[in-house]
Structure formats: C-alpha cells, structure tokens
C-alpha cells in the first residue's frame, strides 16, 4: 500500500513536468497545462514562469503592432492633408547626377557657380557729406570688431553675416510696401534686395558648420542684430541713398575680412578643413572642396553686393528712383 502511495506521488510530479514541457497549440492551452499541476498539488513554478514569458512576449508584440498602426495612420493622414491642399511632397528632388537632393532650405535650380573673376579692389571714394558719414560710420564699427574677434575669422564671419543679411531684407520690405501703397512696380529691385538677403543668410548657414560660437557671442548677435535692424530701418526711411552707401562700404569691409581669412588659411594658421556639404551644393563646388574654396566664393558674393548697393546709391544721387533703372536680378 505504501509503495502504491509513493508511486502515485511520483506520477503526480512527473505528470506536472510533462504537462509543462508538452507543446501547446495556443496560449490558452498553455495556460491550462500550467495550471493542472498546481491544482493537483504539484510544483507550479515552471508553469507560471512559462506563462509569464509568453505573456511578456504577447504584450511586446501587441505594442509593436500598435506603434506600426499609429505610424501608418500618421502617414495616411499626412498624405490626405497634402492631397487635400494640392501640395504634394512625395516627389523627391535629385541633383544633375541623379542622386537625391537632401536640402529643404534651397532647391537645385537656386544654386549657382560664383563669379570669382570680379574686381575685388573697387572702392567708392567718399565725396559728399553723406558719403563721408557712411564711410566713417562703417570704419568706426570695424574697430570694436577687431578687438573682440581678433584673428578668429570663423566667428567674425558669423557675426558679419548676421548683420549683412539685414539691409537687403529691410530695403526689399520697404520697397514692397511702397509698391503696394503707390500701386507701382519696383523695377525688379524688391527681388534683387531679397535675393541679397537670402544669399547672405546662406553665408551664415555655411559658416555655422565650421564655427562654434560661444554663448556670449550668440548673445552679442541678438543684440547687434536688434540694434542694426532698427537703425537701418530708420536710415532707409530718411535717406535710401545713405543707407545703400553704408551697405556698399560694409561689403568693402567684408571683402577685406575674407581676404585676411584667406591669408591665415594659406599660412596654415587656420585649418583648411573640408567644405561643408551645404556649401558644396549651394555654390556647385567640387566634392573635394575645402574651406578656402568656400571663403573665396563668399568673398566674390560680397563684391557683387558691394557693386549693387553702390549702384543703387548712385541712382538716388542722380535724382532718380530705383524703379527707373532695371535692377541687376541674379547678379552674382
């Protein structure tokens, strides 16, 4: 009798193990199999462990499926919005060589090859009182800039471009408002000045890839931009010929700064690192272009802006309005 009782106990334990190791065709069957040894008085730990493992796996798969469904729903919603407004973003732009275009801030047809053959030595000799005021105003601004940045031309270029991008936007905005008020065209000068502002902004986006401004330099940018925007706005309202002359002299100083930048690059004082990808695409530079190539094309852009603003000032000095002379649209 005692041997039968011992055998029954052994069979119960063996049965618990067999119930756990038997393959279940569904999670419900597995759960039932895990529960039997516990009800029969056997060890329940293996069955519970298996149930928990399968439960965790099931939860993970459910969460993954839910995320996939949410992502799919968002994609469908975006497509619906684009289709509703008629603005399709699915078409990918490509370069001339067929590779994908990765920039959203400018398009392939907005790129160009800079004209580096432009005369960099041109200078407008100040003759009138307003010209002299404009000239010495710019010269006075150069002195504190030299002290603050010294030979750190990367950060100096960053500061310069945050200022240089303001006049074109202010002038274009005021001409735009004037065109609306007077119901007259601008002779293309609105577009020319806004192109200048955009070009200067792209200079800034480029140098932000190679310069690492400190927090106080960023704070200085905010201060200088705020002061200069309002000052130039008032100056343009009072005297457009004076405002354009100031920008012409600012661009002459920019040419000088970038020339010094190039000298330090050639002397090895500044590392001639590879050109940022955004610069290679924007100016259509070769794939192996360097920082020196970038500074060279930026300097050429500044020379073109110098010519445009001195030209605009000369138009006003001759007693004409800008609309009377066709604007040099796309003059790079």
Curated annotation (Swiss-Prot):
Co-factor requirement: Fe cation
Class of enzymatic activity (EC top level): oxidoreductase
EC number: 1.10.3.11
Record's subcellular location: Mitochondrion inner membrane
Cellular-component GO terms for this entry: mitochondrial inner membrane; mitochondrion
Protein residues bound to Fe cation 1: 161, 200, 203, 302
Transit peptide: 1-54
Tissue: Expressed in roots, leaf sheaths and leaf blades.
TM annotation in the entry: 157-177, 219-239
Key words of the record: Disulfide bond, Electron transport, Iron, Membrane, Metal-binding, Mitochondrion, Mitochondrion inner membrane, Oxidoreductase, Respiratory chain, Transit peptide, Transmembrane, Transmembrane helix, Transport
InterPro entries: AOX, AOX_sf
Catalysed conversion reaction: 2 a ubiquinol + O2 = 2 a ubiquinone + 2 H2O
GO BP annotations, alphabetical order: alternative respiration
Keyword Iron listed: yes
A single MF term (Gene Ontology): metal ion binding
Induction per the UniProt record: Induced by cold. Induced by drought and salt stresses, heat shock, hydrogen peroxide and methyl viologen. Down-regulated under oxygen deprivation.
Subunit record text: Homodimer; disulfide-linked.
Function: Catalyzes the cyanide-resistant oxidation of ubiquinol and the reduction of molecular oxygen to water, but does not translocate protons and consequently is not linked to oxidative phosphorylation. May increase respiration when the cytochrome respiratory pathway is restricted, or in response to low temperatures.
Similarity field: Belongs to the alternative oxidase family.
Protein name as catalogued: Ubiquinol oxidase 1a, mitochondrial
Upper taxonomic lineage: Eukaryota, Viridiplantae, Streptophyta, Embryophyta, Tracheophyta
């Amino acid at each position: 009798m005692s041997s039968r009782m011992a055998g029954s106990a052994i069979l119960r334990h063996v049965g618990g193990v067999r119930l756990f190791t038997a393959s279940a065709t569904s999670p419900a069957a597995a759960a039932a199999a895990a529960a039997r040894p516990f009800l029969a008085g056997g060890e329940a730990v293996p069955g519970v462990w298996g149930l928990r493992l399968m439960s965790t796996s099931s939860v993970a798969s459910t969460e993954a499926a839910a995320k996939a469904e949410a992502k799919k729903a968002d994609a469908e919603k975006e497509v619906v919005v684009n289709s509703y407004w008629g603005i399709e973003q699915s078409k990918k732009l490509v370069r001339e060589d067929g590779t994908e275009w990765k920039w959203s801030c400018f398009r392939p047809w907005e790129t160009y090859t800079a004209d580096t053959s432009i005369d960099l030595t041109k200078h407008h000799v100040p003759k009138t009182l307003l010209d002299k005021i404009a000239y010495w105003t710019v010269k006075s601004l150069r002195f504190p800039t030299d002290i603050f940045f010294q030979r750190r031309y990367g950060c100096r270029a960053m500061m310069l471009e945050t200022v240089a991008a303001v006049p074109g936007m202010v002038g274009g905005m005021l001409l735009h408002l004037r065109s609306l008020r007077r119901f007259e065209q601008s002779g293309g000068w609105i577009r020319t000045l806004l192109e200048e502002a955009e070009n200067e902004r792209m200079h800034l986006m480029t140098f932000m890839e190679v310069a690492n401004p400190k927090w106080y330099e960023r704070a200085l940018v905010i201060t200088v931009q705020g002061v200069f925007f309002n000052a130039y706005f008032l100056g343009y309202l009072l005297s457009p010929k004076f405002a354009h002359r100031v920008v012409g002299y600012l661009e002459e100083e920019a040419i000088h700064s970038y020339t010094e930048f190039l000298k330090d690059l050639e002397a090895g004082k500044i590392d001639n690192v590879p050109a940022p990808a955004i610069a290679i695409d924007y100016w259509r530079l070769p794939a192996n272009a360097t920082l020196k190539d970038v500074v060279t094309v930026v300097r050429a852009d500044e020379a073109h802006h110098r010519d445009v603003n001195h030209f605009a000032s000369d138009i006003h000095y001759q007693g004409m309005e800008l609309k009377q002379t066709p604007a040099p649209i796309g003059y790079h």
